[in-house]
Amino acid sequence: KAAGLREFQVELGHADFYRGLAEEAGMDEETQEQLRDLIENKNYFGVDELLSSRNLPEETKQGFLKLLEMFGSAGQIAQAKELTANPRALKAIARLERIQELLEDYGLADYISYDLGMVSRYQYYTGIIFKGYTYGTGDYIVTGGRYDRLLEQFGKNSPAVGFAIEVDRVLTALLRQRIDVPFTQVSALILFDPAAEKQAIRLGRHFRGLSL
């Protein structure tokens, strides 16, 4: 909103929901990686083919196929409970439910949708993951999530949340949506004779102190 966009959606998922389902299915790491890539790309036939080749129970296979279709309103959260009894996955669902409550209290729920099949190729995500979308771009304009153990690699044990804004895509969206962004900038150019160099430097420092 601060950038000027009026119509946008932030899509929420949880990294541990997929991990819980994979854990419940007893998948090896290689299969989990392959399946993650297929789900990320919403490749229904690829998921079907991969799981069929692993001789998994039909119920398990159908559960992962349903995962590809579980995106949209907050009602997807309740449906997700029917897919699993895994504690890790259910804890992820409970977290999403709590976040939905908070978003409603803050009056932000209309900007939010859910994708239970949202996965990330980045293994350091440990909780909520999200992507933001708007009209006029072919991809997300912001992406991020929670990573509780990433900072351990840099010597600090601390939970964290981070995100990245795709500035070029935001600007493209603003242009295509014909949104004018207020822009105020005062520029100053100081011309001086060599004899006035010191005074010009002082004046330049003064202007920079005023963020000009």
Q: For each predicted feature, which ranges?
A:
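Short, surface-exposed recognition loops or helix-turn segments adjacent to catalytic cores
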Residues: 7-17, 35-38, 113-117
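Short, amphipathic alpha-helical segments
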Residues: 12, 29, 41, 58, ...
